[in-house]
Amino acid sequence: MGKRKSAAKPPPKKRMDKLDTVFSCPFCNHGSSVECRIDMKNLIGEASCRICQENFSTTVNALTEPIDIYSEWIDECERVNNVEDDDGA
């Protein structure tokens, strides 16, 4: 008589990688110079460049991550550039 087969252990869950909190500046193109901070008390997120002192602020919610603030900044820069291009043409 043999031993009863034991149930296989479930595979371990994969850990998600942390998202970046420092990014390259869209104005001076300096890598790792933009730092994002989230103030949950006042519901404000701020991205600022340490080199050229450019900054961007936006409203945040409980699910907002630093990459969201940076992405909004990039989107706003592109929107402003497109408006200026349309006015000049």
Swiss-Prot record:
Single Gene Ontology MF annotation: RNA polymerase II complex binding
The keyword Acetylation belongs to this UniProt entry's keyword annotation: no
InterPro entries to which the protein is assigned, alphabetical: Elf1, T_Elf1_sf
Chief place where the protein resides: nucleus
Gene Ontology BP annotations: transcription elongation by RNA polymerase II
Taxonomy, superkingdom: Eukaryota
GO cellular component, as recorded: transcription elongation factor complex
Keywords: Metal-binding, Nucleus, Transcription, Transcription regulation, Zinc, Zinc-finger
Location of the protein in the cell: Nucleus
Binding sites annotated in the UniProt record for Zn(2+): C25, C28, C49, C52
Disulphide bridges, residue numbers: none
TM helices/strands, residue ranges: none
General function of this protein: Transcription elongation factor implicated in the maintenance of proper chromatin structure in actively transcribed regions.
Family, per entry: Belongs to the ELOF1 family.
Name of the protein described by the UniProt record: Transcription elongation factor 1 homolog
Species of origin: Oryza sativa subsp. japonica
